[in-house]
């Protein structure tokens, strides 16, 4: 996988089409999880569960930001054994799986949850492992404009989308301030240009979902 390209290409989708992901792609995802997906703490037991749209009613009562759940044709649950580093390990693994889905031209959206037991009960899961991460995935709604990132270059070129069903990424100029909020004076001079390590560090931060 070309991680740099996938990190730049990925986007967090807020509206999915009803089209289901082909079984072949789902099989590739499972194989990747079993054989390739890196673990920060290999000794932590994990399990990957792929759900279809039929799971949405159960998830609506147990997951989502302030009980608002993103509807999708599929949901990915990463289960984990209890461990002091379970959250970090699961986050690392799921983000890698998100990049794999991006490589397969499949869109994703992380979902918020606070109660693993509530989700397990809603889905009738009997595994002793805990819900550690949830991602909705499928094919995002098509928009009139394909431009995705609102990343402003050092030469002030701004790329924007007029209509979108995804969360746009922030430009370096939107993220970075000089000594006080909203002060951009001297920002370009401080970071020099694209090969400047400071600019590259801020650009990397701007690629987060």
Regions found by a protein language model. Give the residues of each.
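Acidic, surface-exposed loops and disordered segments
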Residues: 1-209
